[in-house]
């Protein structure tokens, strides 16, 4: 059996960021329930962490096998295996790191798009790695950007954060990156850097002043240090797609879930089959 393999270049060619966002939005609008998924399995290994992330849909099953490396190495290395849902035979393999780099900002933007102001956006991004740059690319695909400032350990917190419409946190930080008192009242903040309950990128004041959107309430209370360390409860959290219209200060806290990889992998496969109608799964 020879399986199709989608490397980073193929994934980027077949599913540009705006189509990845649309795939996530369609899945959620179509009734996908993030709370129905199973938690990731995590194992500490000498150089970092090993993760297994399985998910199932009406047409496919899939699993991502990923490692999260300690500082100084590429953070995420992964492979994704997609299975046909009817036969359970392997259907395709994917570069799991590229899939992660695409799906994480797609989910973030799907979560906050209803709350983005209708003007060119000033964006501040903490983190110059794949996720920081992926969020920049995805935001630019769905909105006009007036300015983008990238903040790193070397640069510190830019003064422009006070004017930012959107702040993205995509780092390995374990403590808040900035004082939220410096932010606009109507800011949209995206925090996706950690899935550990003892690490956070934003402070308690932001968590308590914002509408806090999460992928799944139980997952956030188990894995998201921004939520846990702020002392938030289930009543303080809003599942993705359920935030009230008109919310002004918004925080999306994402830790990454297996359904997201499956949704985007299926979208890549559909795009390839659409481009090559005779190709069987």
Where are the model-predicted features located?
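N-terminal ligand-binding/catalytic initiation module
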Residues: 1-101, 109, 119, 269-270
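Glycine-rich adenosine-cofactor-binding loop
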Residues: 105-108, 116-143, 152
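A short helix->loop->beta-strand "cap" motif at the edges of active sites that frequently abuts
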Residues: 144-145, 184-187, 209-210
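Adenosine-nucleotide cofactor-binding segment
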Residues: 144-177
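A short, aliphatic-rich alpha-helical micro-motif
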Residues: 160-162, 183, 207
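Rossmann-fold NAD(P) dinucleotide-binding segment
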Residues: 166, 172-188, 204
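Rossmann-fold NAD(P)-binding glycine/threonine-rich loop
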Residues: 192-244, 262, 267
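C-terminal catalytic lobe of FAD-dependent flavoproteins
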Residues: 247-281
């Amino acid at each position: 059996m020879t399986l199709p393999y989608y490397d980073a270049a193929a994934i980027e060619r077949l599913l540009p960021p705006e189509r990845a966002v649309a795939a996530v939005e369609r899945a959620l609008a179509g009734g996908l329930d993030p709370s129905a998924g199973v938690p990731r399995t995590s194992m500490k290994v000498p150089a970092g962490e090993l993760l297994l992330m399985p998910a199932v849909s009406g047409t496919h099953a899939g699993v991502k096998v990923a490692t999260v490396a300690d500082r100084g190495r590429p953070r995420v290395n992964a492979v994704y295996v997609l299975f046909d849902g009817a036969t359970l035979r392997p259907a395709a393999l994917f570069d799991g790191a590229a899939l992660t780099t695409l799906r994480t900002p797609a989910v973030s933007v799907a979560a906050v798009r209803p709350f983005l102001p209708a003007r060119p956006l000033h964006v501040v991004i903490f983190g110059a790695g794949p996720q920081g740059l992926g969020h920049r690319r995805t935001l630019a695909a769905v909105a006009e950007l007036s300015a983008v400032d990238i903040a790193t350990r070397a640069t510190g917190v830019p003064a422009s954060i006070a004017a930012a419409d959107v702040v993205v946190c995509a780092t390995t930080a374990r403590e808040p990156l900035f004082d939220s008192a410096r932010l606009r009242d109507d800011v949209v903040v995206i925090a996706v850097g950690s899935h550990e309950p003892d690490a956070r990128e934003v402070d308690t004041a932001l968590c308590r002043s914002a509408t806090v959107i999460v992928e799944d309430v139980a997952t956030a209370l188990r894995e998201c240090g921004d939520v846990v360390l702020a002392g938030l409860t289930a009543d303080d959290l809003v599942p993705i797609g359920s935030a009230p219209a008109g919310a002004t200060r918004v925080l999306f806290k994402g830790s990454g879930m297996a359904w997201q990889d499956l949704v985007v992998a299926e979208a890549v496969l559909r795009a390839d089959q659409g481009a090559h109608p005779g190709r069987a799964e």
